[in-house]
Each structure stands twice: as C-alpha cells, then as structure tokens.
Amino acid sequence: MSTVSIKGLEGEAPTKNEVLLNWIAENVELFQPDRVVFADGSQEEWDRLTTQLVESGTLIRLNEEKRPNSFLARSNPADVARVESRTFICTPTPEGAGPTNHWADPAEMKAELTERFRGSMKGRTMYVVPFCMGPINDPAPKLGVQLTDSEYVVLSMRIMTRMGAEALAKIGDTGSFVPCLHSVGAPLEPGQEDVAWPCNEEKYITHFPETKEIWSYGSGYGGNAILAKKCYALRIASVMAKEEGWMAEHMLILKLTSPEKKVYYIAAAFPSACGKTNLAMLQPTIDGWSAEVVGDDIAWLRFGEDGRLYAINPENGFFGVAPGTNYSSNPNAMRTMEPGNTLFTNVALTDDGDIWWEDLENMPEHLTDWLGNDWTPESSQPSSHPNSRYCVPLAQCPVAAEEYNDPQGVPISAILFGGRRPDTVPLVSQAHNWDHATMIGALLSSGQTAAAEGTVGALRHDPMAMLPFIGYNAADYLQHWIDMGKKGGDKMPEVFLVNWFRRGDDGRFLWPGFGDNSRVLKWIVDRIEGRVEADETIAGYTARVEDLDLTGLDTPIEDIREALSAPAAQWKSDLADNEEYLTFLGSKGSAVPAEVLEQFEALKARVAAAES
C-alpha cells in the first residue's frame, strides 16, 4: 500500500511505483485538476471517452454502417499542425541544441512553463497515460507516462501506442519512464462553459535531453500533444540512441518478399510530402513480389547479436495526412480505415455522416467543411485542412507484417533516402559506402514546387529527413551516423538514393511512381544480391535502364533513361548551396565529421571530371 496521497484520485492508484506516484502527486498540486484518472486502455474507457466527447461537441460520431466506431474532430483553426517555431531543445548550452533547433535554457524554460502550468487543469480531469514504445513484450522496453487534460490525446494515444494497464505493469514498482507533461492551457472556472477544442494562443513544445523530459503547453493537436510521437520517438529517443549506441530515425520499415520467397526489410527516410506512407503500404506491380508494412513513420535501429542492424517500429498506429490519400495512391491505407475504429481530424463531413477530403474518389455535391461551414465543389477553399489526419490502428492494415510486434525487430538490408527533386538526382543510385551514404543523407533536400511558398526550384534542406526532429546538435548527429558505420562495418545495410519525382522539360513526371516503385526496389534487391552491374555517375552507382524490370510498363524508354541521368551542370549548380549548408551544420559548437567533408570533396571532384 502506497503512502502517497493523490488529490482527486478515486480509489487506490493501480501502481505502487513511488517515483511515479510522487511525480503525479507533485503535478496534481501544480496543475490543480478536479479529478485524476489512470487511463487503462480498455474498450470501456474508449467508449466512455468518445461518448463524453460527442456530448461535449469535440467529436462527431460518424455513420456506423460506413465508419463503425469512428469519429471526426474539428480543431481550433489556430491549432492545426506541429509548431516548429515554438518547439525547443533545452540543453545547458546553445551548442548542445546545435544550429537546427530552437534553444532555451532549461532552468528558465521550466520556470516559465511551471507558471503556465499552475492551475491550467482547473475544472478538468488529469489523465495518467502510461505507454510503451514498441512491442509490449520487449524485454528492455522504453516506457513513458504522459499527464494530460485532453481526452482527445488519451484516445489518440490508445491508437498510436501500447497504452494503459499493460504499459503500467511494464513500468512496475521500480521501473523508470520518460515523464511527459501536457496541458491544453485552458482552465475552466466554476460554471464556465467549455469549448469544443480547448487550446491556448501561447504554445510551447519543450524537450529536456539531459533529464529525458517532455513538457508541452497550449496545443491539443497531433505531434504537439501526442507526446509519444515525434517528441519521444524521435527528439528524446535520438538523444538516448546516441548515448546508448543505436539510432532513432524518421523512416518507414517495409517488408519485401521476392518470387523465390526470400524476405528483405527496407527502411526509408523521406521528407514530408515525398510518399513515405505510400511506399510503406506499397502494392507491387511486378509479378511474384509482395510488400507488407512494419512501420510508416519511425524506425528504431539497434545492432543484433549477429552484428546486423535491426529495426522496430515504436508506434502502434498510423497518423497519416488525409488529403491525397485514395484507392489509387494508397489503397492499403484506405482499406486500413474500412473496419472503423478511426479518429479523423479536420476533414470534411458528408451529409450522410461519412468523411471526405481532397483527391478522395466520388466528390459529393455538398459537404460540411473542416471549419463547420457548407461546402460545394464550387467553393474556393479546400473542404479539408491540408494537414488533416486519420489516426487508425496498425493492426487493421491488410498488409501489416506480423513482425511489427516482434521486439527483436527486423534485419535491415537497405536504407533509402529520397526527396522531391524535379531534376539533378537520378531515379535510383547506390552509395559507395557508409561515409558516402552519410553525406547523401546530410544533404537530402526537396525542391520547392509552384504550390509552395518560396522560389520554385529552391532547395529545402532536410538532413536524413530529421531536420525538425534531431534532439541535439546536428553535427554530432552526423558523427553518430559515422560512428555507427564504423561499429557495424561490412554488416551495415546498403544505402540508396531514390527520386520518384524527376520531371521532363515540359513538366511531366518521367517515372510513374506509386506501385511501380516496386521495380526500383527489385533493382535494389538485385544490387544487394550482386546480380546486376551499375553505371558510375556523380550520384553513385546508378541503375542502367536495361537492368530495371519494365515488364508491362508503358512509360517511354527515353523518359526512364532521362530519369536515370545525373546531369553534371545540375549537380554543379547544387554544390555552392550544399557547401554552405554543411558550413551551417558545423556552425554551432560541433564540427561536421571529417568523413562527410571528405565525401563532399570527392563529390566536387566527380562533378569536375564529368564536366571536362
């Protein structure tokens, strides 16, 4: 029996962990909630909370025949996405956070947020949400506990993590956990009516790498509030990984099976809007090949006993961008939602209680848009917010690989980097070695499109697709990649650079993409197995058109040949920008690894040789 008293808790706490109970009790005094509830992750809890939120107007219950046990939330229009400008890495010195993060002094930030948190849960319930990152049966699990005043967050965490009583049992009486504090920052005075989506104009998403803590205030949305996702799984985990000799990466994990039934596991890091979820749920268009998903967003990679790199998916669900997802671009994502049990946010509502978003089939004549207004096809604004989301259990995916529940993880054969480049970067190239791969990842970028703000064609750098998520100095992060390569030696995965987005002079895409990307994956497997040669280009070992399986593809061979080219003039025009970016990455307390700089000098030499 614990001696710790928690104000507002009905009955006895379901744990004897004194550290956990004392932490909860201290924060109850700070936040001053009306009630304290331990989230158990049960169906009864889901039903109770969803019913409560439907009654309060936060959720809309969808058509039970079309979307069983599914709900739509509409957020405050000022709370619709991750707020990178209000995301802080709080290390003792600015050099610890490095050039790519917003830094704040840990003591000052804690003092400021403590005052923000004081009384911020008045009139609300504090939920204690224990969760496990990755399979619950992991013998050495990474655990966390989030305190939150948002029922929406509790529901989202139930989908996205292994949450509740099982995770609390894993923490046990003496186990450690990452403490996560979250408040929407909207206290209620007695008699004050609540709003459908409580939040605060002031937002803080703060990380304390030294003490492995996460404090978030003011937002109820997505990665700002579901703290297991980017905050823990990438920002804090990347620090843990550096300290403990593993990797936390913004990567999908794909299981690929050949016609001979040989299995390959591929991890891939793409910046946003570059097709990560679509590749994770790939439907191959070449006979005899099948693909399954282990994860669509985050990979934790550790060395196995055999010296190879093994990956787990620390998540348990998909938190996908809705617009653009349909039965053509990603049929498996659509099928994952068909059984229901899905939380939709900021999409449109049909008149018969279903959902709709841009690029979905069968546009209705009338909708209620994400702001609650009437919408017709003639409306000038999109019906759904561009960052609207579906949150759905991974287990419902028809191509979910059973290995996603294996705590040993899966051995990675290849790592892919890819951006959205209309020119320059070939369809697929292999890195010369791990050091070359690290440079490729460090300089990963996407070209601006006409749809984006900024100069068309200008590069947006996103090293390893981790720019918003590296929890420490980016130069030290690159050094960690180099160090992992040294440790793994010749057992490290082969690394490839892909680009599905090459365009011709007239602006058309040169490669069909989507399911046909399986043809590129087949070439990658052929390279791993030593079955095909490659052309030595500026980019690396680039595929030859005759080695790609183009059976049944009606794309002109000239287009594919152009997609595989690495024009020297285009590579040369990137060099100054890339050199400047490497200088930037090394500009705050830590140097970019010598190996990366040597690889960049070798790249410059290849460009010069190709020009002569």
Curated annotation (Swiss-Prot):
Pfam families assigned: PEPCK_GTP (PF00821), PEPCK_N (PF17297)
UniProt KW NAD keyword: no
Pathway it works in: Carbohydrate biosynthesis; gluconeogenesis
Known EC number: 4.1.1.32
Disulfide bridge partners, by residue number: none
Gene Ontology molecular functions: GTP binding; manganese ion binding; phosphoenolpyruvate carboxykinase (GTP) activity
Alphabetical UniProt keywords: Cytoplasm, Decarboxylase, Gluconeogenesis, GTP-binding, Lyase, Manganese, Metal-binding, Nucleotide-binding
GO biological process: cellular response to glucose stimulus; gluconeogenesis; glycerol biosynthetic process from pyruvate; oxaloacetate metabolic process; propionate catabolic process; response to lipid; response to starvation
Binding site for Mn(2+): 230, 250, 297
EC main group: lyase
Active site: 274
Reaction catalysis annotation: oxaloacetate + GTP = phosphoenolpyruvate + GDP + CO2
Residues binding substrate, per UniProt: 82, 221-223, 272, 387-389
TM segment ranges: none
Function comment: Catalyzes the conversion of oxaloacetate (OAA) to phosphoenolpyruvate (PEP), the rate-limiting step in the metabolic pathway that produces glucose from lactate and other precursors derived from the citric acid cycle.
Family annotation (HAMAP family): PEPCK_GTP (MF_00452)
Subunit structure: Monomer.
Family of this protein: Belongs to the phosphoenolpyruvate carboxykinase [GTP] family.
Protein name from the UniProt record: Phosphoenolpyruvate carboxykinase [GTP]
Taxonomic placement: Bacteria, Bacillati, Actinomycetota, Actinomycetes, Mycobacteriales
